[in-house]
Amino acid sequence: MTVRPTLRPKPGSIPTDPGVYRFRDEHGRVIYVGKAKNLRARLSSYFQDFSALHPRTQTMISTAADVDWTVVNTEVEALQLEYSWIKEYSPRFNVRYRDDKSYPYLAVTLNEEFPRVQVMRGARRRGVRYFGPYSYAWAIRDTVDLLLRVFPVRTCSAGVFKRARSSGRPCLLGYIDKCSAPCVGRIGVEEYRALAEDFCAFMAGETGRFLRQLEAEMKQAAAAQEYERAARIRDDIQALRTVMEKQAVVLGDSTDCDVIAIAEDQLEAAVQVFYVRGGRIRGERGWVVDKVEDVSTGKLVEQFLAQTYGGADDEESTTAIPREVLVSAEPADRDAVVAWLSKRRGAAVDVRVPQRGDKRALMETVLKNAEQTLARHKSQRASDLTTRSKALAEIAEALGLAEAPLRIECFDISTLQGEHTVASMVVFEDGLARKSEYRRFSIRGAEGADSDVAAMYEVISRRFTRYLEESQRVGELDTLGESGAPQGAERKAPRFAYPPNLVVVDGGRPQVAAAQRALDDLGIEDVAVCGLAKRLEEVWLPGEEDPIILPRTSEGLYLLQRVRDEAHRFAISYHRRKRAKALTASVLDDIPGLGPVRRAALLKHFGSVRRLAQATAAEIAEVPGIGERTAQTIYERLTSVEGGQRTQPENSKADE
């Protein structure tokens, strides 16, 4: 897969200023929006090493036909413009936070003459005050039922309110004093609005004021020997305390903050938020997002803050954005985010990572919830038997297979200009990753323009040659056993003895043709082959002129994407290690005055080249036999190695 020549901007045409850029497809539709402190540096990163890009970034670049940008003066302006464009275009490749479920809110319709309290879901409406979200709607109804004793605001629908107004008779709640019955004029407009605003104030955390007020009224009633009224007020106080007890106290009474934590893996991320008002947890919410590109946790935090707080209406920003936002990782452009949030709120907003105390403990709780949300989401999609069965059935139907492919093997090639070419093989059985079966290959003979295709032919040939050899060996062992061979010896199945039902290759028609040709040359006819191209996620079959397009919501497509992305991750991690090993080894070999004895001393002292590369010149000079001048030379040479290549070895099988 390559980048379209028309997509790559001319050298020097991209400015170095901050700005926002848009990728468009061949129909002119915006498919991705991003921002950058330096447009030239950011956009150039998309056109360097295509194979090293995140799988979904490769898909985006392959789909794009054009890119344009807008220069701005500050990073704050870039953040604002990025949010505006994402909201306007809804680009398919931008991160989109979606709920694991539709969370209910307690809503007060302050935009109405007589505000109503109700349960609301979905998009926010202008002029409505929201509290929550809550995990369950019944929790809201229980809370409202208790609060109506003290704040008898209406909960009826517009139709019921209109009928009561016409008939002059209130509903049942009006008769039992759980509604002030504005429909029949028992309370004036201004007095009723004050009552609704008191309800909102209590829900916002101003609990102490109302408790003190009611306690004073109860004492006055008792002193005046109005014992029935005092008893009613006592019950009102108990109702408020019951509501407060349901909301755990976690921080100081004056603390208003949102606590945001992100848990992530290679493909997805989960965000969990606890809403703290008046020191109490007033609500919580979780999102799950597909990672479109290889973004940092700080960038995910920044994108989440922009999408979450950017959606608040200007008139509601003061209440939607708290004074303090606690995050698990600092936003990528913290100063710009803080300035933008402060401008929207109309007052200072502090965005920080808590380091100690109660806030740090609460952050760890929120992070644990985020990890559980991600695990629950992945389990639901990947481990649920019904979902897995559906995915495998969809794949079988789309590819015309006689039965579901219970064992899928996916192969991916990773190379850089034909050097250090490697391949990966990942295995999914019954829709689940079987990591003990993963294999990796160092490609021996793939060079030149068609190295990717040649490498695919080689790895398929090697894998299935081993299959034929080992299956024959297993047959010979079975024959020996039947003829009286010694019993009791452990018989462990060879690593390549089991064939897959389906081979998936990362690529389009050329890669699929190479894989099929390798199988044909070996005389293997009972293994199906398909390829998943990054462009538009097309599924290619051998000998077909046109690809198969699975629906984007298809569980079968989701499983194929997971298999392909896992193969890509496994291949590229091995490729980086191999390339880094070769590069660092050659650097040590080329350093003047550094012979075998000194190299051995360095490795013995630091344990590995990677740790040596992380050491300072002074630390290197502490090694016996290494002077300050040699240490400085070693330090300068090793620090020139690309940082992205210093990856930790992955726990996997040895090269095949």
Curated annotation (Swiss-Prot):
CDD domains, sorted: GIY-YIG_UvrC_Cho
Domain of life: Bacteria
Alphabetical UniProt keywords: Cytoplasm, DNA damage, DNA excision, DNA repair, Excision nuclease, SOS response
Any one GO molecular-function label of the UniProt entry: excinuclease ABC activity
Stored InterPro entries: GIY-YIG_endonuc, GIY-YIG_endonuc_sf, GIY-YIG_UvrC_Cho, Hlx-hairpin-Hlx_DNA-bd_motif, RuvA_2-like, UVR_dom, UVR_dom_sf, UvrABC_protein_C
A GO BP annotation: SOS response
UVR domain residues: 208-243
Gene3D superfamilies: 5' to 3' exonuclease, C-terminal subdomain (1.10.150.20), GIY-YIG endonuclease (3.40.1440.10), UVR domain (4.10.860.10), UvrC, RNAse H endonuclease domain (3.30.420.340)
Entry keyword annotation includes DNA repair: yes
Keyword Cytoplasm: yes
Localization per Swiss-Prot or TrEMBL: Cytoplasm
GO CC annotation terms, alphabetical: cytoplasm; excinuclease repair complex
Residue span, GIY-YIG domain: 16-95
Assembly and oligomerization: Interacts with UvrB in an incision complex.
Stated family: Belongs to the UvrC family.
Function noted in UniProt: The UvrABC repair system catalyzes the recognition and processing of DNA lesions. UvrC both incises the 5' and 3' sides of the lesion. The N-terminal half is responsible for the 3' incision and the C-terminal half is responsible for the 5' incision.
Name assigned to this protein: UvrABC system protein C
Primary gene name: uvrC
